[in-house]
């Protein structure tokens, strides 16, 4: 997977300074209205896969109403927003049309066109909006799912699905730019590590400077500084646990390949046949839970090999939580067995 070079928050902000996620700012890039000959204008780079809607053009032409100014790229004279209005104006026989020029780049112009067709005029189809979002993902991979969703009329969840399905062709960035224009690291541990290095290299730097360079909030930079002053790791305990390398966990999976799970399988089979367990509601519930976790080693290898990369940390955390619960169950049962044995010993003495 190809990564973008120069992905520091500062560089990302420079690359997308004009489109920092607050898509509404693009509207400020429009010139005053001017009249332009209709024959001087070229068709748009339209997000509509089906092209123009002839019936909609006829409706606009027949309405007789004054149509809003269209938006045009000044350098190429291509229409960014308003092809239906341009066709309707020609159908009316007019030779000039009201135009506002867009002062921005080609990528910004496409995003403006998509957003314009989402918020007014003839709506884009769902397929067109998805195609537009995929294109924005390619040109602005550092934008957050919410920011792209705002521009294309899709939910953040849908954009996230498109991102995960198109990662092979989409350059990857280690930050996301939100709707507020702020760059945030995808992995907060990296931001904390960078803040730690910057603080050690330049102890006199202000927290705002450190936060801006590391792509973290000032409060996070402050927390890192406090941790360093106490001689602690810049990472909270929960993040340090997630950092355990996968290779360190591999032997635990491999060790089951020698059939060490077999005795547990036999024990579970005998337990399932025990009437005192299987003939009670609580016993059957316990058997269901035990059967869920009694997965063979080869099944684990298959399941773990198909976990989506973006779900690894979440599933690992859930697995640790389940392991903690079962560990506590085992300890309580062990203690119950000890207490019962002690009770029998006392009764024997008595």
Swiss-Prot record:
One of the GO BP terms on file: streptomycin biosynthetic process
Biased composition (Basic and acidic residues): 177-189, 223-242
Biased composition (Polar residues): 1-10
Keyword set includes rRNA processing: no
Record keywords: Antibiotic biosynthesis, Streptomycin biosynthesis, Transcription, Transcription regulation
Gene3D superfamilies reported in the protein's UniProt record: Conserved hypothetical protein from pyrococcus furiosus pfu- 392566-001, ParB domain, Winged helix-like DNA-binding domain superfamily/Winged helix DNA-binding domain
Pfam families referenced in this protein's UniProt entry, alphabetically: ParBc (PF02195)
Region annotation Disordered: where it falls in the sequence: 1-20, 168-189, 211-258
Keyword Transcription part of the UniProt annotation: yes
Protein name according to UniProt: Streptomycin biosynthesis operon possible regulatory protein
Native organism: Streptomyces griseus
